[in-house]
Amino acid sequence: MATRDFVVDVAVYQSTSMSAYKHAGARQVIVKLTEGIGYFNPKASDQVKSTHDNHMYLHAYHFATFSNNAGRAKEEAKFFVSRAKKLNISKKRYLWLDWETGDGNVVINSASSNTKAIMAFMKVCKDAGYKVGLYSGAYILRQNVDTAKIIKKYGTCLWVASYATMGRIDKPDFNYFPSMDGVAMWQFTDNWCGLGVDGNITLKELITDTAKAPAKKPAKKEIAKPKTPSICYVPVLYGNPNYKVRLLDSKGHYQKYIETNTHWKVWGVKMIKGMKCYKIGTDEQWVPAKFTKIVK
């Protein structure tokens, strides 16, 4: 399973020092470099330097203003790449496209034209040698973008924003995870640890190199495999007999729902997305153990 790293994304509204974020537990930083074809974050250089000084991994993002215009998207991407090169952003890291409503960026055009423009931007960055990803809110990605097409081309590359509640959140509550395919990172709050910065958690290993020496891991101890229970019971939850529980497949993709007040034979046990799950059928039918009771 991929390492779950806390990641912060910073722009002109945040400090030039990453020390507080590092102290709170962040391991990676995404610095806003550019917007449109003329704006450069005046704090970017100092934020990049502080990220390195604090021995954190560095990525960068660009705020789109091209809407569904593929030609304009290429121009913005070239501007973004030029700035990334000037700041020596490693090609082992990600260049993210922030495509959302704001500053003239229109998202309500057809999903087809939106996707074409987004992919034109990503191609320029990819051709320049960088890893690429797409950021937006869960609703926009579901309604206004053909994410399946993007995932087919670039793999698991979505950075999705979806908050359980507004205000300070220190740790993600995966009961509110925006279930969709291709999610590499989840932005779960805009006020992580009360620091006034967006908080994100990785679901994919974004750092796959050894550019910086990783902390030594203790030797693995042999752990006895958990005994597989024979039957699990899914009780009525939250006092609502109509509440249903969503299953996952073995790779962590959400599947169909099952009724509560039901019994299931258990065929296996494994950790999926950090949750203990029971296999109650095929490899696409794993139920989170937290919603069940074991019946002997």
Task: Tell where the protein language model's regions lie, with residue ranges.
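Substrate-binding cleft of extracellular glycoside hydrolase catalytic domains
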Residues: M1-M122, K126-A128
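Beta-loop motif signature
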Residues: K220-K279, E284-K296
